[in-house]
Regions:
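Glycine-rich, flexible loop/turn motifs
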Residues: 49, 58
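Enriched for short, Lys/Arg-rich terminal
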Residues: 1-16, 24-43, 56, 62, ...
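Solvent-exposed, amphipathic alpha-helical segments
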Residues: 44-48
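Generic structural signal for secondary-structure transition and capping sites
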Residues: 50-53, 67
Length: 98
């Protein structure tokens, strides 16, 4: 899955979405336990692909873990964690609080 968004210079940046095994397992968990949370996770994924640094879920850089790592609030307890690269966004987890 690829999406593009505009940067400050107006140039479109395309990034590929890469879903790591832990993220896929977390998403399966939410489908079984609470489908509303699973749908919210997918909505957040779409928002991240549009703009990884702004939008729903209160994006927050995780500067102490790794450069380019961000989180967004899925529920009060759980976060989606993703890593933004030049040409891809790795979705790492969708459960727990980093």
């Amino acid at each position: 899955m690829e999406r593009s968004h505009k940067t400050e210079g107006g140039k479109a940046v395309r990034r590929e979405a890469v879903f790591q095994p832990e993220f896929r397992e977390d998403l399966r968990h939410w489908v079984e336990i609470d489908r509303k949370i699973a749908l919210r996770a997918l909505t957040i994924v779409e928002a991240v692909l549009r703009d990884p640094f702004a939008g729903i879920g209160k994006p927050k850089p995780l500067k102490y873990l790794a450069p380019g790592m961000w989180s967004r609030r899925l529920t009060q307890e759980h976060r989606i964690v993703y890593l933004v690269g030049d040409d891809r966004i790795d979705f790492l987890q969708a459960r727990y609080h980093y």
